[in-house]
């Protein structure tokens, strides 16, 4: 079971959708990755593809992948910073079907060889939605302390995670379960009212 925890408008312009939202998509993607990024293939869709370069969408996503927030003054220089860090960044056109017009498909490779694919949507006003993780449909914003669990669809995983949160006095605000198919890959998203202690996350991760 892989465990990821995330996140939870001041911005460097010009657009809340194309810049602030794009930074947040990149930021959540690198949190989900959980290790240093070696390569990032960023595929843009719709308005992101058509007008994103002029609005700095490409630099904004890379800034988020570097751990920057929307108000970070280094955003315009994110490409140079990524190059200095040895991160290979490429851009292309996404082949997503019927996606939100401000969508980015981000394919990451970490230093261990781990790969992750995230599809994020920028909804305006710096609001975003993470629509897919590794091809599995999801729906969360990262506005709350959020625990994302990537596991096999088998009995016991849900109760293990919820028991850990109860033991740490963390209240679950919402919980969503997604799976590719019965017994296949699954994603559990738990938005919480409190920050999730690191030792709680590790206690679940180390049992698998």
Q: What are the functions of these language-model segments?
A:
Residues 7-12, 20, 25-148, 154-155:
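Regulatory modules associated with amino-acid/nitrogen control
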Residues 90-91, 171-177:
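A short linear hydrophobic-aromatic micro-motif
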Residues 124, 153-172:
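Short amphipathic alpha-helix segments
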Residues 131, 166-167, 174, 195-202:
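Long, contiguous binding/interaction regions
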Residues 149-151, 189-194:
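Short beta-strand-to-loop capping motifs
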Residues 179-187:
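Short proline/glycine- and acidic-rich turn/helix-capping motifs at secondary-structure junctions
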Residues 207-208:
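Conserved small/polar residues in nucleotide/adenosyl-binding loops
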